[in-house]
Amino acid sequence: MNLSNSIGTSPHVLIMAGGSGSRLWPVSRTNKPKQFYDLLGTGQTMLQHTFDRALALTGSPSRIRVITQTQWGDLVREQLPELAEEHLLLEPIRKQSATATYYGLLSLETETDQDAVVILPCDHFVLDRERFDESIELALRAAVQTKALVIMGVKPTRPEPNYGYVQYVDNPAAGSEEARFHVKTFTDQPSQELANTFIRSGDFAWYTGIKVGGKEAFLDLYRRWMPDLVEVFAEFEAIKDPLLRKSLIDKIYPRCESVSFREGILDKAGTLLLQLGDYGWGDLTYWAEIYREHEKDYFGNAVNGSQVALFDSHNNMIHITGQRIALIDGLENYIVADSPEGILVCPRHKEGELRQRLAVLRRQQTDKNGGDKPPRLT
């Protein structure tokens, strides 16, 4: 679906691929985080799915940029061979999404500063691509017409405490479908009780992290709310040669503030529009989310692995990497996941305690290594 017919020119897309995904231990780790895995057994990684969505919006890989950390550059090259080297933007160190987004915006080769930009996180899934494209098109139209930033929200199907929420009010100036709401508040990962309240109130949506707007609209928000970051990048912006820019970015990044786009921009911005959609969206942050969305066998087992044999086992989340053979007998409501460096066997209802358990494991590993911090548990 090329959107050039509806907004004048195809949008540019920034794919944010710099997160570490540490909650999906032991599969998602520092050396290979979750966006580089096929977590739902579809035959494509999360990054590849996101690139396909971006390509459907732009019509050409030349209008797509992927932003990731330097250490994962080879993974992106391997999984996206159609991405030109100059369109792979590498962060020397992690500085969160506000800096990464600004870096990406300045790297776009736009015809004008009014060109539309779509920012896509790469660790999400979308089940209904047609409805997703339609929702993006509506958001792009609103962004072009109003010169405002439009964020994408999804109608919640349950009180999910692991997601971000956006509260909204009617936007009387909007048409029947195009960005019909103004953004009122953001809340990140509320308590279960508060999530229940949000669902009952009826004026909250899940915040997808997808943002749509003209390039100049994004840059204006940075000039107003993050002027120090703009100043740090002034020399980078003045240089047009891609090779010189890549050498300069190593000097720039240590001076940048580490803050999310929501905290640095969205929480401060006055006028934000919400495009509310329903296209089977989810954020694969926890094993529980992967289990919920994964195809299951007759006994409720979600299995990712080519050589897994299950006997008398029900409602398990099984993720076995590579060609390893696994035989599981008599297990119910468990998570079993492996990687070359670790194995997780955990009741599904105890996944929320995993981070504390890992902290204990790290301390034990440190003690065994004579006080040296173990490198393989992050």
What residues fall within each predicted segment?
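Short beta-strand segments
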Residues: 15-17, 67, 118-121, 151-155, ...
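Conserved core of the sugar-phosphate nucleotidyltransferase
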Residues: 129-250, 273, 323, 348
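Short coil/turn connectors at secondary-structure junctions
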Residues: 9-11, 60-62, 84-85, 112-115, ...
